[in-house]
Amino acid sequence: MSTPTVKLNSGYEMPLVGFGLWKVNNDTCADQVYEAIKAGYRLFDGACDYGNEVECGQGVARAIKEGIVKREDLFIVSKLWNSFHDSERVEPICRKQLADWGVDYFDLYIVHFPIALKYVDPAVRYPPGWMSENDKLEFSNTPIHETWAAMEKLVDLKLARSIGVSNFSAQLLMDLLRYARVRPSTLQIEHHPYLTQKRLVDYAQKEGLAVTAYSSFGPLSFLELNLKDAHETPLLFEHPAITAIAEKHGKTPAQVLLRWATQRKVAVIPKSNNPTRLAQNLDVTSFNLEASEIESISALDRNLRFNDPLAITNFVSSLCAQYGFYAPIF
């Protein structure tokens, strides 16, 4: 089974449906990547912060060794973590991540957050997470334009074919596009019916960036993180507006949610270790929703963001003590 692609402004084709690697356990990660490749997945969305890139690479290596795919058949994505925004840190950490994956280049390398944190030596702690060695949130003074110049050099060195950003606002994109020598190819954001971010999506696509949605199922991804909003928000899988559309089309609620995105040219990166759901998630471009159905799903928007790292990691209180105010990321 294959999936349609979207052409990036770098000239490369990116699959509209991929496999997300956030919260994939190290013990099962290699097997999950391998099975996903066998099922037809070609895009794998990883990151330094996920802490499983070595295992991801093992799954890829096994599939290549068995002749299931060639490296050029895959679209491998990784991300630059906040602790490595200093311009001199970007290339070395990218090379480390490539070595962890066991590949020579990333198809797409993304700035994970528009936040520069104090450098943490990978030999001391890897992945670094949000906190520095003294268990505090410590920022670096490195501006985005310096980090982006170092990202552009990765393209020059052929370490990354395309580069992009994640969790950027429209204002940050506007600024970045004023000076970028190599334009960002993609914007990855939290995007689901409870957080449609329509104006941001429209702006990014108008500027020629492909948009990728993470957490397409809304609160479901965050239940295990003990996030209050996730537990108090109705699951999209059970929402009457979603289940009615799913029943009409003979599809699962998950497929409807993913199709709501892909039909608007927004890429998705769900994950599953269930073979049936793996196939179902990949098969979300073979049917079309009616315009009225897309509108009714979009009308569920609450501007409700679940991926607020400050809330998830429970260090709001330490920030308040340190700075005397709440330091929001979004």
UniProtKB/Swiss-Prot annotation:
One of its GO terms (biological process) is D-xylose catabolic process. Keywords: Carbohydrate metabolism, NAD, NADP, Oxidoreductase, Xylose metabolism. Pathway: Carbohydrate metabolism; D-xylose degradation. It catalyses: xylitol + NAD(+) = D-xylose + NADH + H(+); xylitol + NADP(+) = D-xylose + NADPH + H(+). The record marks K79 as: Lowers pKa of active site Tyr. Gene3D superfamilies: NADP-dependent oxidoreductase domain (3.20.20.100). The active site is at Y50 (proton donor). One of its GO terms (molecular function) is D-xylose reductase (NADPH) activity. NAD(+) binds at residues 166-167, 215-224, 271-281. It is an enzyme of class 1 (oxidoreductase). Substrate binds at H112. Catalyzes the initial reaction in the xylose utilization pathway by reducing D-xylose into xylitol. Xylose is a major component of hemicelluloses such as xylan. Most fungi utilize D-xylose via three enzymatic reactions, xylose reductase (XR), xylitol dehydrogenase (XDH), and xylulokinase, to form xylulose 5-phosphate, which enters pentose phosphate pathway. Belongs to the aldo/keto reductase family. This is Probable NAD(P)H-dependent D-xylose reductase xyl1. It comes from Aspergillus clavatus (strain ATCC 1007 / CBS 513.65 / DSM 816 / NCTC 3887 / NRRL 1 / QM 1276 / 107). The gene is xyl1.
